[in-house]
Every structure is written in structure tokens, then in C-alpha cells.
UniProtKB/Swiss-Prot annotation:
UniProt subcellular location: Nucleus
Main location: nucleus
Binding site for Zn(2+): 12, 15
Post-translational modification, as annotated: Ubiquitinated by HERC2 leading to degradation by the proteasome.
Name listed for the protein in its UniProt record: DNA repair protein complementing XP-A cells homolog
Covalent link (Glycyl lysine isopeptide (Lys-Gly) (interchain with G-Cter in SUMO2)) residue numbers: 31
Purpose: Involved in DNA excision repair. Initiates repair by binding to damaged sites with various affinities, depending on the photoproduct and the transcriptional state of the region. Required for UV-induced CHEK1 phosphorylation and the recruitment of CEP164 to cyclobutane pyrimidine dimmers (CPD), sites of DNA damage after UV irradiation.
Domain of life: Eukaryota
Signal sequence, renumbered to the chain: none
Organism: Cricetulus griseus (Chinese hamster)
Gene Ontology BP, a term: nucleotide-excision repair involved in interstrand cross-link repair
């Protein structure tokens, strides 16, 4: 299946929920929405798997790295400890702007 081949997630193609659980998000979105750093995505073991696609909006820009949202959310909980801690950190960042 697509998810097994690219993200090592045992889910058949007909069971895939591309709109929510198995949605793909960009690296930028993962960093902004879940307050993750490059090292959280790429260096922290196990490094998150991703696919590379051409940027559909700006063909001159670099390729996009797309991560599986399910795995990004799980990593964010590892980094921040809980959903509440993540929300608190977002609020602090918003106040500091």
C-alpha cells in the first residue's frame, strides 16, 4: 500500500483516510502548527519519513517535503509531553509576537 511503502504504516489503500488521519502536511505546516524544529523531524530517532513533491504553487521554488500528519502529531506529543503543553506553548508564542 501507499502508506506502507512511503511511511512504514500498515494501512491498505482502501482504508486510507486522506482527509484527516492519513493527511499529508508540509514541513512548514508541521513546524508552525506543532511547534516542531528541524531536528525533531529529521534527527530525533526514529526520523520521520517523508515524500518529496514539486511545489504546485511555485515551480521555481524547492521541492516540498510532505509528512504524514498522524506521525507528526505523535512526534509533537513526544516533544511537548501533552496536547495541553503544546497549546500553552502556542499561546506563549502568540503573546510574545
Amino acid at each position: 500500500s501507499y502508506l506502507m511503502n512511503h511511511f512504514d504504516l500498515p494501512t491498505c489503500d482502501s482504508c486510507r483516510d486522506a482527509d484527516d488521519k492519513h493527511k499529508l502536511i508540509t514541513k512548514t505546516e508541521a513546524k508552525q502548527e506543532y511547534l516542531l524544529k528541524d531536528c525533531d523531524l529529521e534527527k530525533r530517532e526514529p526520523a520521520l519519513r517523508f515524500i518529496v513533491k514539486k511545489n504546485p504553487r511555485h515551480s521555481q521554488w524547492g521541492d516540498m517535503k510532505l509528512y504524514l500528519k498522524l506521525q507528526v502529531v505523535k512526534r509533537a506529543l513526544e516533544v511537548w509531553g501533552s496536547q495541553d503543553a503544546l497549546e500553552d506553548a502556542k499561546e506563549v508564542r502568540q503573546e510574545n509576537r
